[in-house]
Design a protein with these regions (language model features):
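C-terminal helical/tail subdomains of lipid-metabolizing enzymes
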Residues: 272, 277-279, 290-300, 304-311, ...
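Helix-rich "cap/lid" substructures immediately adjacent to catalytic or cofactor-binding pockets
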Residues: 15-78, 430
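Phosphate-/polyanion-interacting regions in eukaryotic proteins
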Residues: 1-16
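Patatin-like phospholipase
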Residues: 55-144, 165-167, 171-194, 375, ...
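Lipid deacylating catalytic domains
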Residues: 109-114, 129-130, 177-183, 224-226, ...
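A short alpha-helix-loop-beta-strand transition element characteristic
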Residues: 143-159
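Conserved small-residue
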Residues: 54, 64, 84, 161, ...
Length: 430
């Protein structure tokens, strides 16, 4: 705070130099842009929201996004890894964002809906103990009004998903259980109903995940750029959430297969896994994408969400090696964030299908965490100007027409819970 006050005191003395430099810049580039266009570029910031991974801990992001929208701070660009890519893809599908309906949709999640037995084939993902069924669970949500799959280019808010590509040399050296098309060792049919963390074999695999959090093993790949704008949004989010050796995703859309083949070839990788392995809170990647012209402006406020920072919990000591490895990434990413929200408390990262009451609790926690950030983001997003008594009026942004199916259509496609366990769980927690 003292440093900010000192900077404000110095600012008045720099005003003259700033005015002079502004005039020189406008004169030098008079054939490229007008003074009004320069002022509009410098005076207005875009909101870039970076959503980090963290499994079930990321349910707090729903409440965080609710608070952002309440403040009128709709993201201009979203980028996410792992669970953050799932929430980002959902929020980006339509404008205005029907956040309350998304909360109702999230409350229909179950383990049987999102997890299944390991697949018999492997082509683009990495063999795991479970098949990730998010694409099936969210099929209606990621359909256009005409019934086609929503592609990255169809999203109402610009969104990109970060996946980790396993380098070919590292992929070839992996144990066969990671590469071969075989059933996982854990085959109990009851597991999809239960928290993923209960199985000792799953816990053992999770310990091995830390080995993938290494730039010599994986590299970050951004899905949503010009080369990948035709990817299905649900496939991008699913690959970004595929914990190596635990959750395995493969596309079910034949149209996607040549696109994925090309992605592996172009990036010289052997498989796509959880984006958190390469960049769990990808603020640096967000900054580079904006620098490269993603938004048409470089003047942006970078707000980062992190739910997977080390938190003491004796029930989940097995997560410590992973959270510590992830924190090493933050040394590189944190300087690019204007503000970093470290959510606390959170749900367990292993709780991938919380009950209705538990989701409500996570939303409250997330709402409270982001509420403390609103004064900061509000100040950062305040326009600035040089002439007159008010900021220049920016040009009207083109209206974005949502092509996503209505939420009433999505909700009507969700089967009501028929399993006694699901009904009992929600009744007990309501």
């Amino acid at each position: 705070m003292t440093a900010l006050q000192a900077a404000r005191d110095v600012l008045a003395g720099l005003a003259g130099d700033q005015d002079e430099q502004r005039q020189l810049l406008a004169e030098h580039h008079r054939n490229d842009f007008s003074v009004a266009e320069l002022d509009a570029e410098v005076g207005y910031k875009k909101l870039v929201t970076v959503l980090g991974g963290g499994g079930g801990a990321g349910f707090v992001y729903i409440g965080g996004m609710q608070r952002l929208l309440e403040a009128g701070q709709v993201p201009d660009y979203l980028i996410g890894s792992s669970f953050g890519s799932i929430l980002g893809s959902v929020v980006a599908r339509a404008l205005p964002v029907p956040i309350d309906e998304y909360v109702a949709w999230a409350k229909t999640v179950s383990y049987r809906a999102i997890l299944g037995p390991e697949q018999l084939r492997r082509r683009h993902g990495l063999t795991g103990m479970f098949s990730l069924r998010f694409d099936e669970f969210a099929d209606a949500l990621f359909r256009r009004e005409d019934g086609e799959q929503i592609r990255m280019s169809d999203l109402a808010i610009p969104f990109e998903a970060v996946v980790a590509g396993v380098r070919r040399g590292s992929f070839a050296a992996l144990p066969s259980r990671f590469r071969q098309q075989r059933l996982a060792a854990l085959r109990l049919r009851s597991i999809p109903y239960l928290p993923i963390g209960i199985g000792p074999q799953v816990a053992a695999r999770m310990w091995q995940v830390a080995a993938f959090i290494d730039s010599r093993v994986t590299k970050p790949i951004v899905i949503g750029d010009e080369a990948t704008r035709d990817f299905n949004a649900v496939d991008a989010a699913s690959f970004s959430s595929s914990i190596p050796g635990v959750l395995h995703h493969e596309t079910k859309d034949p149209r996607m297969e040549p696109l994925l083949d090309a992605l592996l070839e172009d990036n010289d990788v052997g498989a796509l896994v959880d984006g958190g392995a390469a960049s769990n809170v990808p603020v640096e990647l967000a900054w580079k994408r904006v620098r490269d012209g993603k938004l048409g402006t470089r003047n942006a406020c970078y707000l980062a969400f992190d739910c997977f920072h080390p938190q003491w919990d004796p029930r989940h000591l097995w997560l410590v090696p992973i959270t510590q490895a992830i924190q090493l990434q933050m040394v590189r990413n944190a300087p690019y964030a204007d503000h970093l929200v470290r959510f606390s408390p959170t749900l367990s990262p292993a709780n991938l299908a919380p009950s209705v009451a538990t989701i409500d609790r996570a939303c409250q926690w997330g709402h409270r965490s982001v509420d403390r950030a609103i004064p900061v983001t509000s100040a950062l997003l305040q326009p600035t100007w040089w002439e007159g008594d008010r900021p220049p009026v920016p040009g009207a942004a083109p209206l974005v027409k949502s092509v996503a199916a209505s939420m009433s259509t999505v909700m009507s496609a969700i089967p009501l819970p028929t399993q006694r366990f699901a009904r009992w769980r929600n009744r007990r927690s309501s």
